[in-house]
């Protein structure tokens, strides 16, 4: 990507975030084009893409035959096919898996590094963008296209926008917003996704979890009414037989070091500590607070106390902005 990522600053929680323009270099774009695009994706991901309109974006999972996620995808219609955004660390293996059956279909599946991914979040993000685009996405119309640019709208943890555009427009936006907006890198968007409860699947956790273990059903990412797709049997069994015992949790507190993706945490049991869970992502905020996204048993007590392994500091559960009640 010729567009240079912005230098890192410590991320800020959404409630205190000033207007910020963010380069999403840890995320990557991929596309599927061709006459069979919709049919092909319908047979590969958990969401019902046949029901998707031009105005929607969805979080969907791409699973293996056992229902474990290679990746999750932020999916939207693009040209005569679809585009999706996922963590850069999983894009190459995810595309390799997706292409396995493509020889039988009229589709072209490819990474897209020509376009640039930017985020706009923080104080009066909408007002800042209103001067630059003729229409902005909203709750009713979550995707807006203008020229070479696609804008995606997110409600949580506070209104924010993801911009998929060409290099020239990315440079124009940077020039226009540089004076009023702070600039930051992917860590800020990651912090917002953790706060929003959007599961982050990096390479360390690819092929490890069924979608429901990361709350995808609560985020509208799984259709239980659509036809066959890879891994469907296991995903359906987890719902209808209650086979899923895990959920995605948000923890905050302090830690002397950031836990890495794939690492476990420790849960306080009386005087002792017991290993539990798998970390998906963690970020340290500018106020020193640590936010951790972790998959654990879905019956954790809300007042449970956790820590990074052998650490002197503790973490506790924060509520997510959505419900897991079915």
From Swiss-Prot:
One of its GO terms (molecular function) is folic acid binding. It comes from the Bacteria. Keywords: Cytoplasm, Folate-binding, tRNA processing. SUPFAM superfamilies: Aminomethyltransferase beta-barrel domain, Folate-binding domain. Its main location: cytoplasm. It is found in: Cytoplasm. The keyword tRNA processing applies. Folate binds at residues 27, 189. GO terms for cellular component: cytoplasm. One of its GO terms (biological process) is tRNA processing. Belongs to the tRNA-modifying YgfZ family. Folate-binding protein involved in regulating the level of ATP-DnaA and in the modification of some tRNAs. It is probably a key factor in regulatory networks that act via tRNA modification, such as initiation of chromosomal replication. This is tRNA-modifying protein YgfZ. The gene is ygfZ.
């Amino acid at each position: 990507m010729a567009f240079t990522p912005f230098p890192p600053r410590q991320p800020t929680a959404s409630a205190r975030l000033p207007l910020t323009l963010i380069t999403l270099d840890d995320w990557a774009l991929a596309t599927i084009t061709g006459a069979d695009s919709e049919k092909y994706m319908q047979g590969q991901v958990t969401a019902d893409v046949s029901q998707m309109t031009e105005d929607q974006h969805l979080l969907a999972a791409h699973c293996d035959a056992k229902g474990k996620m290679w990746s999750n995808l932020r999916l939207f219609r693009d040209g005569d096919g679809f585009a999706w955004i996922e963590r850069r660390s999983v894009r190459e293996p995810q595309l390799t898996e997706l292409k396995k059956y493509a020889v039988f279909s009229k589709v072209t599946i490819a990474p897209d590094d020509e376009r640039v991914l930017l985020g706009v979040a923080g104080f009066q993000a909408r007002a800042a963008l209103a001067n630059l685009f003729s229409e902005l996405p909203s709750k009713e119309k979550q995707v807006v296209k203008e020229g070479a640019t696609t804008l995606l709208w997110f409600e949580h943890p506070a209104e924010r926008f993801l911009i998929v555009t060409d290099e020239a427009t990315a440079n124009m936006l940077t020039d226009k917003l540089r004076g009023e907006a702070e600039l930051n890198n992917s860590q800020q968007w990651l912090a917002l996704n953790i706060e929003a409860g959007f599961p982050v699947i990096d390479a360390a956790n690819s092929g490890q979890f069924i979608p429901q273990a990361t709350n995808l059903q609560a985020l509208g990412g799984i259709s239980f009414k659509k036809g066959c797709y890879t891994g469907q049997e296991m995903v359906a069994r987890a719902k209808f037989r209650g086979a899923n015992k895990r959920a995605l949790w948000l923890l905050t507190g302090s830690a002397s070091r950031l836990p890495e993706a794939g690492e476990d945490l420790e849960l306080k049991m009386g005087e002792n500590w017991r290993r539990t869970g798998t970390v998906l992502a963690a970020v340290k905020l500018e106020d020193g607070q640590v936010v951790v996204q972790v998959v654990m048993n879905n019956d954790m007590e809300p007042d449970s106390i956790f820590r990074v392994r052998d650490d002197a500091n503790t973490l506790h559960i924060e509520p997510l902005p959505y419900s897991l009640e079915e």
